[in-house]
């Protein structure tokens, strides 16, 4: 990934807290924004933690991660965490994805 605009970067935690094939949720803006960061094949992905499939706002960080696909534990919707695209419904709206990088051991998100 190219260097991101430093003015817009937010450090969310240490890079070593996210092992491969694992998802970690982070709360930003006084818990108003939930973003998950996943590491797959040593690459980081950042996306909205809350599923778009309904009013329950189910956390995707508790779902099943298989490669770059994550499945909502509540309704079974599946998303591509690299693009945010819906792979399988009932969700119809994509996830918001964020640029993310590991800089000197710190995970930084452009959000």
Identify the role of each PLM range.
Residues 54, 74-75:
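Short Cys/His-rich metal-coordination motifs, predominantly Zn2+-binding knuckles/fingers
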Residues 70-72:
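Short beta-strand-alpha-helix junction that forms the catalytic/metal-binding core
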Residues 49, 75-76:
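Glycine-rich His-Gly loop
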